Amino acid sequence: MKHFLNFIGGDFVATGKTFENRAPVDNRVLGLVHEAGQREVDAAVAAAHRALKGDWGRMSVVKRAELLHAVADEINRRFDEFLQAEMADTGKPHSLASHIDIPRGAANFKVFADIVKNAPTESFQMTTPVP
């Protein structure tokens, strides 16, 4: 059975609590989702803070935008894989998922990368609170 893990700090993380992900069309089990609890949320927040203080925080806005465009390109490259997963997970028909959901997922990465890259940075400058 497929396990859907949390991705925290560059690693896939299993948890002690899972639930079945069932296809809405026929109720078959698609896999087990590892539910994030307080420990996983805290670990994800700590990993985000480390990334902000590390390479990601030192990376230029242009480079970050390039990486987000690369994510969009990878979604498009693996279009059929994402399409099959979306249809199984949501029960949406091929016509809807292939013309709206997957293209929009890829487009969102590009749009927000371009907005940040092309917007005046002074409107986004702020201190990130550290616990």
Task: Name each model feature, range by range.
Residues M1-P131:
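N-terminal Rossmann-like NAD(P)+-binding subdomain of aldehyde/semialdehyde dehydrogenases
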